[in-house]
Regions:
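Extracytosolic and intramembrane catalytic regions of membrane-associated proteins
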Residues: 118-218
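Internal/C-terminal transmembrane anchor helices
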Residues: 71-97
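Alpha-helical transmembrane signal-anchor/signal-peptide segments
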Residues: 96-120
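Membrane-embedded alpha-helical segments of integral membrane proteins
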Residues: 15-64
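Membrane-interface helix-boundary motifs at transmembrane edges
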Residues: 7-12, 63-76
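Cytosolic juxtamembrane helix at the C-terminal end of the final transmembrane segment
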Residues: 59-68, 99-107
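Negatively charged, low-complexity tracts enriched in Asp/Glu with abundant Ser/Thr
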Residues: 4-14, 139-140
């Protein structure tokens, strides 16, 4: 009897450890996907994680059925967490975790982005790629300021001496739109964004004076 209790305790501990490892690995994936993965890699990593979680979910369901006469709390917890992580990942391409991380990203990197904006406005930072398409490649350090490569897009209105600076949140993939944190002191551009906010407020909103969160489809 004592041996049986010891075995059950060991199994419970192993199950708890597996749950913690699964959650930790998923969190690493979520943050890596948001901050670091190139946009052309994201759909494949997302698909791989979805398939992995689906396989784990099926395994948990099978085990619950087999152990239904002597079901442990940890088994149900494992099933629930796996199902929850699968839902978070599968639903609208990571929409829920990405929305949470986006809010964290905006607050944590606010001062760093503000510093970059000041450098652009004083012409210390300019487009620096060979294609001369408005892209400025920033040094690759942590935390990432502009996702999917740490590039920013700079547009200068020479007539009005104003600038619009885009920091990527997501570069999108397949037919997905791109999303940005955008600074602009150009009144015409502001009007465009205000119109976008009116049309689709669930995807576009004003963060503060001169700052917007905008979703665009190129």
């Amino acid at each position: 009897m004592q041996q049986t209790n010891t075995n059950d305790k060991t199994k419970d501990e192993q199950m708890t450890k597996k749950i913690l490892i699964l959650v930790a690995v998923w969190l690493i994936f979520a943050f890596t996907d948001y901050f670091y993965l190139p946009y052309f890699v994201q759909p494949f990593s997302w698909l791989l994680v979805c398939i992995t979680l689906l396989v784990l979910l099926v395994r948990q369901i099978v085990k619950v059925i087999k152990e239904r006469k002597n079901l442990k709390t940890n088994r149900l917890l494992n099933l629930s967490i796996t199902l929850f992580l699968f839902f978070l990942t599968f639903y609208n391409f990571n929409k829920i975790p990405n929305s949470i991380i986006e809010k964290i990203d905006w607050n944590i990197s606010y001062n760093k982005r503000l510093k970059i904006v000041k450098e652009v406005l004083t012409n210390r930072l300019k487009p620096n790629t060979e294609m001369n398409n408005g892209i400025c490649r920033l040094p690759f350090d942590f935390p990432i300021i502009s996702n999917g490569g740490n590039d920013i897009w700079i547009y200068g209105n020479k007539t009005e001496s104003t600038k619009t600076i885009k920091f990527w949140i997501s570069r999108g993939f397949f037919d997905s739109p791109q999303t940005y944190f955008i600074f602009t002191n150009d009144n015409e551009v502001k009007k465009q964004y205000e119109e976008q906010i009116k049309r689709k407020p669930e995807y576009n909103w004003k963060l503060e004076e001169n700052w917007y969160r905008i979703m665009e489809r190129d």
